[in-house]
Amino acid sequence: MTSTQSVAVYATLILAIFCFNDIHCDPIAEARAAAFGEREARSAGEWKQFDVNGEKVEVNEQENREIIRQAGGDGVEGSVMVIDHAKGLIIWSIPRAGECYLIGGVDKQLPDAQELLHYFRSAQGSADGEGVQSALDYVKAEDRPVTDLNLLAPEVREACQGKSVYWLEKSSGDNNEPEKRRWCVYAYVRIRGVLVRYRRCW
């Protein structure tokens, strides 16, 4: 037995004693971390996954966060929206627009993680059938680029690498300028009967 293996075995025995009353403790994994400097990153809470309206929704009640992933097409990745209720922030990666966006504040129409989990569980598979009840429209604040990229959630950081990031603001509903543009990219995410929409035109 090598000296490294001896350290691992010894660490396993020691950690097994400390793990005796902790059902979530894995002495083997802890021993590997102690002997070889390995340690897995652990989320602060458990993620629940649902397939709704063609979107993959992940909900973490402890962190009060939601992730909505849309399927891509035509060689373009789908958009990813992270709703962080704890920080009051929405992070949105829209590959078709070639940019990423931040929304400061989470509209009260959007359910928090606990409400969304309760909704999915009580719907018993019928959530797909709920129609759109309201919509939240956003426009890009051209003069407000995001300078602190640490605000980007880890789930979209790679997708937003090297792209422009802007704040989105609620639309007043009277902006007809896109009608004069040549073409537009439309993006929306549906969350329990509420549409979050964005339109970028050139």
UniProtKB/Swiss-Prot annotation:
InterPro entries assigned: BRICHOS_dom
High-level lineage: Eukaryota, Metazoa, Spiralia, Lophotrochozoa, Annelida
UniProt protein name: Arenicin-2
Key words of the record: Antibiotic, Antimicrobial, Cleavage on pair of basic residues, Disulfide bond, Fungicide, Signal
The keyword rRNA processing appears for this protein: no
Disulfide bonds: C100-C160, C184-C201
PROSITE patterns referenced in this protein's UniProt entry, alphabetically: BRICHOS (PS50869)
Pfam families: BRICHOS
Function: Has antimicrobial activity against the Gram-negative bacteria E.coli and P.mirabilis, the Gram-positive bacterium L.monocytogenes and the yeast C.albicans.
Presence of the UniProt keyword Signal in the record: yes
Domain BRICHOS: 73-168
Organism (species): Arenicola marina (Lugworm)
Signal peptide positions on this chain: 1-25
Propeptide: 26-181
Protein's GO biological process: defense response to bacterium; defense response to fungus; killing of cells of another organism
